[in-house]
Amino acid sequence: MSQFFFNQRTHLVSDVIDGAIIASPWNNLARLESDPAIRIVVRRDLNKNNVAVISGGGSGHEPAHVGFIGKGMLTAAVCGDVFASPSVDAVLTAIQAVTGEAGCLLIVKNYTGDRLNFGLAAEKARRLGYNVEMLIVGDDISLPDNKHPRGIAGTILVHKIAGYFAERGYNLATVLREAQYAASNTFSLGVALSSCHLPQETDAAPRHHPGHAELGMGIHGEPGASVIDTQNSAQVVNLMVDKLLAALPETGRLAVMINNLGGVSVAEMAIITRELASSPLHSRIDWLIGPASLVTALDMKGFSLTAIVLEESIEKALLTEVETSNWPTPVPPREITCVVSSHASARVEFQPSANALVAGIVELVTATLSDLETHLNALDAKVGDGDTGSTFAAAAREIASLLHRQQLPLNNLATLFALIGERLTVVMGGSSGVLMSIFFTAAGQKLEQGANVVEALNTGLAQMKFYGGADEGDRTMIDALQPALTSLLAQPKNLQAAFDAAQAGAERTCLSSKANAGRASYLSSESLLGNMDPGAQRLAMVFKALAESELG
């Protein structure tokens, strides 16, 4: 089954171009009117007095190359089909459209199709009288013995250098020389957990190695140099850094580009950046470019690192602002700092105290919740994410630990409730921890005001309902908690009646085919009908334990 949002395969590249133009922040992109099979994007603010810088290649590497058209970078980009070089006619058309007397530089990634098609177009353009030079970028170091290293993400840095000198009116020889220098001092290496999905691909599964990563996988899914037996971010980054250090000159300041190959989450890219800043390369890194998606391979689950050796003109070119959609501003690696809060601690202050009755209730409730962990997880797996038992068991173990270490104010219920509310936000994940914290915090405040325990618990319930948005009948723990607390208002010492009310409320959730709160609200009626809400069941079991005890 295809893993790609698109309309028609034949319109895919054109649709991609349209989207890029529509969202251009500088409003400086335009299609070149031509044969429908020729897809060229150009600068609207074209200045033919300057050297034109043209790049392109197969689509599927977005934002390359359209995302780098604009003042200070590319003049035009020629877009082929997905992972297919543009035609000779398309490249020649682009040259003719944007090249003036200053000439043009073609920047080409080192793949056979691109070399041949751009190369023949350059020869034809020269025959027509155009001053054309072509630079082939081969920055991939993953296969060091390869006579023709592939052009990958480092190509974007060459765009930046060439565009800088072209924008400032330098002649073609100078633009070419500076771009060649940049290319010869640019080193890239990629890694991926899996290859990419092609549009409309239904049979072939992306290549992947469970528990492993493929070093040097190509930007079209070509096999890499080796499969490594780890997916640990620090180990992967350090291995890549070792290979970059082996290829780089022994000294010299660097800018390093962190490129998302298309399918890596923002969170993972942040972790990768952190690992790079902790790697043996960190002392030489003056500038970071990214993390960002710059040269992708559709949805490939991978990333690449590119290092460029800095000298004065290269550094200035990299740091100069441009008017493109996707060039990220380089930044120096930042120090991780902490700001000390000037506010007084909001933590609950207390003195531990003893109360045998309260201690017995805390022991009973926490033990009940711990014992219910597996049962509630199984119930939650049918209507949620299968972790409610573990969530409440973790909270129960925390409170029980404080009890056993005699670190609870058992003789001051207002402070005890406030402390429980504070701890629950720390040890309970998700919204459940916050809701129960609201419940106990509000109840504790009501006790401070002189209310009795049942009144305080009902106040906690009211605040839980207000902030959480759920009510009785919404298939949540409130379906058991509210009937039980209502029963206690009428009969404060009748725990059996409270349990009966809670159990009846929990059982009513089996008859409900619609949840109005929590994760269950996203499930179908078929998934809910006949299954008791685990939160309601949990509360009913707590009241059952209390009713059957001799603590009441």
Swiss-Prot record:
Class in the EC hierarchy, top level: transferase
Key words of the record: ATP-binding, Calcium, Glycerol metabolism, Kinase, Lipid-binding, Magnesium, Metal-binding, Nucleotide-binding, Transferase
Cofactor (UniProt): Mg(2+); Ca(2+)
Gene Ontology BP terms: anaerobic glycerol catabolic process
PROSITE patterns, alphabetized: DHAK (PS51481), DHAL (PS51480)
Record's comment describing the protein's domains: The C-terminal domain consists of a eight-helix alpha barrel. The eight helices form a pocket that includes a tightly bound phospholipid. The cellular function of this lipid is unknown; it has no significant effect on enzyme activity.
Name of the protein in question: Dihydroxyacetone kinase
